[in-house]
Amino acid sequence: LLLHYEVSNALRTTLELEQILYIILTAVTSHEGLGFNRAMLFLVNDKDKMLEGKMGIGPHNIEEATHIWKGIEENKMALEDLINAYDNFKRDPNSRLHNLVKSIRIHLNESQGVIALTALEGMPFEVITEEARLSSEDKYLQMMGTKYFVTAPLKAKDKVVGVVLADNIFTQKPITKADVGM
């Protein structure tokens, strides 16, 4: 409930789409939130019938992950502090994960993989076993280096407007049914 309260309060402070998306992804990755290592957001472009990479939050490699998480721990940063770091995120043109995600365009077609399927079906997918991973291989997942992950549609008035993908690529912490249900 505290997570919901903090995110709701943060969302009430802005009308800027980029900042709203940042708040959502920060809640997905924060140790006080859902605690995933990375979160990526793809928005639906109805005109071109595509998903377009919009934002990526999280480290690009294990060294960066260690550095970031150590800084969060040393500075005792809470979810609110991480949300308030939006201006730093906005000014960092060197975020490799963010730039990688922004370079991705996925046709809204079943053959394009699980990210496209999430948007088309309007339901979450969990790739948390080896069997599921082998059946969901696609070039976009390979680009991001992700093996086990969850996806969830982002909806507005029952219409899918985007897809969030989250993984634990660095900690290799198993993604459980409880994580997916949060």
Enumerate the predicted regions with their spans:
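Signal-transmission linkers at sensory-effector interfaces
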Residues: L1-Q19
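Helix-loop-beta substructure at the N-terminus of cytosolic sensory domains
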Residues: T13-A65
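Regulatory sensory and allosteric helical modules in signal-transduction proteins
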Residues: N61-S136
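Flexible loop/coil segments at beta-strand boundaries within sensory signal-transduction domains
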Residues: R133, K155-V160, I169
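Regulatory loop-to-helix N-cap segments in sensory/regulatory domains
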Residues: S135-K139, M143, K147, N168-M182
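Short glycine-/small-residue motifs
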Residues: Y140, G162-V163
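A short, aliphatic-rich beta-strand micro-motif
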Residues: K147-A156
